[in-house]
Amino acid sequence: MGLKNLFEKMEPAFLPGGKYSKLYPIFESIYTLLYTPGTVTHKNTHVRDALDSKRMMITVFLALFPAIFYGMYNVGNQAIPALNQLGNLDQLIANDWHYALASSLGLDLTANATWGSKMALGAIFFLPIYLVVFTVCTIWELLFSVVRGHEVNEGMFVSTILFALIVPPTLPLWQAALGITFGIIVAKEIFGGVGRNFMNPALAGRAFLFFAYPAQISGDTVWTAADGFSGATALSQWSQGGQGALQHTVTGAPITWMDAFVGNLPGSMGEVSTLAILIGGAVIVFTRIAAWRIIAGVMIGMIATSTLFNLIGSETNPMFSMPWHWHFVLGGFALGMVFMATDPVSASFTNTGKWWYGALIGVMAVLIRTVNPAYPEGMMLAILFANLFAPIFDYIVVQANIKRRRARTNG
């Protein structure tokens, strides 16, 4: 008996009236993960499209692969030189299970480490965070699905991977579990679940950690996976001394724009490489999963605001001098613009609203980065702020359209 036949034989017990009917969401999630659902349309429909929600989420997940793999490589690429500068590898192996595992696997952690060793070390930091986040999120999704009696939505795959990509590699696992719990329950499930959340769950979870546990999510010691090493992000360096202050934390060499574009600098695991993000972004824009109007609006808002600050200038705030092309490649701007701001649930759905929504994100991101002295990164808060205004933009656009059509009809 094949596996599919086994599922079909078990299915009646999970259907309404069956012995395990309350557990149908769990059965359905496993079955549809392995096989295409047999449900088909029997009547006329307005839209016929092979891209259902499952395939859409899988496409977004796959589009993140360039950022995932480069992020893992960069964790090792930043950590290994720092380790050799500190010279405390034996102490780390004794006190940090990440390096104990790396040592047991025979990874080369010397200055001559290969890209494979760097990638493997990065995976040792990234995969546990992702597995914890995925497991906790799955438990909550299954629990709410069983209680409410609806199917498990595949959006959890995207929420979990995005959350894992926007946190530091050194984040404690229990905080990762707590952050995604907040994002799933408070930002999504209490408002009705999938399709009803007005904020991005991954960003809401990270914002919770930022305000609740700032020492583990920000500062100078969390971005390089080497205990005892302190290295500020490029945004922090610029905020202290302008472009001339940008330098690699280990070698002291200047950070070029190409270094930032490719991602050769410390930061959150999925945010460092603008190049990798744009490769994945091209996929979701081409497949029309991401709205290009939102991305264009973010760029327009960012360019206009940064140019305005450049013209105003400041003798005391170096961030006024940051041009738009540096804003584009530093911090979480690219990842937020391409994969976070374009979330179809929490973003505006009208075409005109998408322009205003995107522009607000671009303006607020630069405004927070430039004017706020306590927090050099502004993309996370800018997107969450714009999420609150997305329904307002749509309401204004819809009402304006109603008035226009009414005037045309009456005229």
UniProtKB/Swiss-Prot annotation:
HAMAP family tied to this protein: NqrB
Protein's gene: nqrB
Catalytic reaction annotation: a ubiquinone + n Na(+)(in) + NADH + H(+) = a ubiquinol + n Na(+)(out) + NAD(+)
Purpose: NQR complex catalyzes the reduction of ubiquinone-1 to ubiquinol by two successive reactions, coupled with the transport of Na(+) ions from the cytoplasm to the periplasm. NqrA to NqrE are probably involved in the second step, the conversion of ubisemiquinone to ubiquinol.
Pfam families in the cross-refs: NQR2_RnfD_RnfE
Sorted UniProt keywords: Cell inner membrane, Cell membrane, Flavoprotein, FMN, Ion transport, Membrane, NAD, Phosphoprotein, Sodium, Sodium transport, Translocase, Transmembrane, Transmembrane helix, Transport, Ubiquinone
Family stated for the protein in its record: Belongs to the NqrB/RnfD family.
Location of the protein in the cell: Cell inner membrane
Protein name: Na(+)-translocating NADH-quinone reductase subunit B
InterPro entries: NqrB (IPR010966), NqrB/RnfD (IPR004338)
Topology relative to the membrane: Multi-pass membrane protein
